[in-house]
């Protein structure tokens, strides 16, 4: 059987959800447990102006566990709670295999109705998360969160009930601050509870995705504001906290599935404009240096494909060209390519081999051009439960 379009796009998340075990189902209440253990052995290297580092590793690659509880009220109304963890700490450098403390990736509650849509509150994915179509298991060359945040502390609304337009999803999200200055010892002892500098202060995004009749089309727009350091947090510019103030971004995708061939071709793209504010550095009471405001523009295009080579075996890949320019003269161009093959050994066991290569050139006024290269190849195994 040819692979369905949903399976081609949703990928591993859909697989983990499909393999979840129902541990309780009674009187309108359903509880599911699921997850996966993921291990990859890899070889990677990076080269920047003839300086090379090579790394071989056997490590965790996104192992996770989730629990979902759904309560049906009748007349199409329902409530849902969802918790998903990762088996990796916030400080992976302390453990080269990337296994660490269990952390919360998503935790949210949902109130909804099949006819009117649903409202989601908590740490969750946003409408921007599922916009692009490119497939990858580990080395994805697209970095969508630089354009629009794909998850966070959010209040979101999703609607799927438009008559005659099955496959159309409309969504909107409002992002709230998630990172705040903690209590106790801190570089900012008098700012406890305030949004941490250069972290998301608030944001809004809207989007739509159509996935039916062999056609895929989606677009999302987001405006995200970041907490500025300013004189309150860094009056003399000593901490180097960054100057990001606001990002406006767009992500889009367009694809078509040739169902008779088991082939999906797609084109992803994005554009973002980042505003950086003016700062004043002072090394002494009598001397100040003003860093003027500037804008950074970023864009990419990425054609890709997903093809069912044979039953339970799929080939996928994509190419990306990305350009970043600053109105002060600095420009960066990146070309990247990814290719992979996956095979199901069992309905709950997936193995794959994936490789990626990226080449980056950076030009700045009065400076020598810098070239960077990254190469990665890995063989992975996922066991779902």
UniProtKB/Swiss-Prot annotation:
This is Outer membrane protein P2. GO terms for biological process: monoatomic ion transport. It is found in: Cell outer membrane. Transmembrane segments: none annotated. Homotrimer. Forms pores that allow passive diffusion of small molecules across the outer membrane. The gene is ompP2. It comes from the Bacteria. GO terms for cellular component: cell outer membrane; pore complex. The sequence of strain B1 is shown here. GO terms for molecular function: porin activity. Changing residue 285 to D: In strain: D1. It comes from Haemophilus influenzae. Changing residue 281 to N: In strain: B2 and B3. Belongs to the Gram-negative porin family. Residues 1-20 form the signal peptide. Coiled coil: none annotated. InterPro entries: Gram-neg_bact_OMP (IPR050298), Gram_neg_porin_domain (IPR033900), Porin_dom_sf (IPR023614). It is a multi-pass membrane protein. Keywords: Cell outer membrane, Ion transport, Membrane, Porin, Signal, Transmembrane, Transmembrane beta strand, Transport.
